[in-house]
From Swiss-Prot, chain A:
Residues 1-10 have a biased composition (Polar residues). Its main location: cytoplasm. This is Cytochrome c oxidase assembly protein COX19. Residues 27-70 form the CHCH domain. InterPro entries: COX19. A motif (Cx9C motif 1) lies at residues 30-40. Disulfide bonds join 30-62, 40-52. A motif (Cx9C motif 2) lies at residues 52-62. GO terms for molecular function: copper ion binding. GO terms for biological process: metal ion transport; mitochondrial cytochrome c oxidase assembly. The keyword RNA-binding does not apply. Present with 5750 molecules/cell in log phase SD medium.
């Protein structure tokens, strides 16, 4: 099998993800947020920049809102908390209102 | 002189017949056997109760152990593994390049590609990446993905919070789906001298086709193909030809 590292036995015991698998987004409810995130990553040469991480946060929020992910605090996902003045709006909405 | 009989205080076994001695011995033996039987019954019943208790306790104990260690392939859900302090990015000069590659089994008629070639992350910084899968066949198919990480020594530091691997994913005929991976590199990566010279980590996913004994992993598509306007008109015309109009002959007779 190509890509399978054979040098280490530890690689033969893969660890499962902490929260299991994402449910499939059959209806494409969060595709818009994903496309914005991917566009942002292209602009910064795929560096995990803070503004792209905020778009990733919007995507995960969309999944939580559509029952495609369990609700959790942002600190448990390594993402910054919402700004106090946003009242839960996405960064894009806050930018549009300004 | 008055000859008074001496009262019998001692049990004189010599005066008993052989049969009476035999009966006494059997009586004693039966009493001992009864005691032993009761003792054994108590022991067995207590062992049974103990194992019944262990059986009831096994389910929560097993769940607790698996949540803590991931034993048996169960996803680790104990919060202590990925505590919040592990998700704080480490301030280092260089970023680690995470490259994404993919592969599909030859018997699985899917296309499966990463949406981005790479992402540069800091240890402890969570990152999101996307793959895209498309089912090219005319049947609903269940696939299952596994992953491998190169170099193998870095696999211990690659932590996936949520992805699409190790579970069956069903794609309807012709369906296209985005599949996210949410992960981070453990902050201990930065302080491990063995990881000093590792600048690249490759995350490789392979999709296989699921297989059931009764063949239900591949099913016929439930969606009916949509007809365009011309096809609908032709279909209606065919229906008109095949089903001529019924003439009520009684009208002609009355006229």
């Amino acid at each position: 099998m190509s890509g399978n590292p054979g040098s280490s036995l530890s690689a033969l015991r893969p660890t499962p993800p902490e929260r299991g698998s994402f449910p499939l987004d059959h209806d494409g409810e969060c595709t818009k947020y994903m496309q914005e995130y991917l566009k942002c990553m292209q602009l910064v040469q795929n560096e995990n920049a803070m503004n792209c991480r905020l778009l990733a946060k919007d995507y995960l929020r969309c999944r939580m809102d559509h029952q495609l992910m369990d609700y959790d605090e942002w600190s448990h996902l390594g993402l910054p908390e919402d700004a106090p003045g946003n009242n839960g709006k996405t960064i894009k909405d806050a930018t549009d209102n300004k | 002189s008055v000859n008074s009989e001496q009262p019998k205080h001692t049990f004189d076994i010599s005066k008993l017949t052989r049969n009476e001695i035999q009966q006494l011995r059997e009586l004693k033996r039966a009493r001992e056997r009864k005691f032993k039987d009761r003792t054994v019954a108590f022991y067995f019943s207590s062992v049974a109760v103990l194992f019944l208790g262990l059986a009831y306790a096994a389910v929560p104990l097993y769940r607790a152990i698996c949540a803590r260690t991931g034993f048996g392939g169960i996803p680790i859900t104990d919060r202590r593994k990925f505590t919040d302090d592990k998700l704080i990015p480490v301030d280092t000069e260089k970023r680690i390049r995470i490259s994404f590659t993919s592969e599909v089994s030859q018997i699985l008629p899917w296309k499966f590609v990463p949406q981005q070639r790479e992402v540069y992350v800091l240890p402890g910084e969570t990152a999101l990446a996307f793959y895209k899968a498309k089912n090219y066949s005319d049947k609903d198919i269940i696939g299952m993905a596994t992953y491998s990480i190169a170099p193998g020594e870095a696999a211990q530091y690659f932590n996936k919070i949520q992805c699409f691997c190790f579970e069956e994913q069903k794609l309807a005929a012709g369906e296209e789906i985005d599949m996210p991976v949410f992960f981070f590199i453990d902050p201990d990566f930065a302080s491990d001298p063995a990881m000093r010279n590792i600048d690249d980590i490759i995350l490789h996913y392979t999709f296989f086709r699921a297989h059931y004994g009764d063949g239900t992993a591949v099913s016929d598509s439930k969606k009916e193909p949509e007809m365009n306007a011309d096809e609908k008109a032709a279909s209606l015309a065919n229906a008109a030809i095949l089903s001529p109009e019924v003439i009520d002959t009684r009208k002609d007779n009355s006229n």
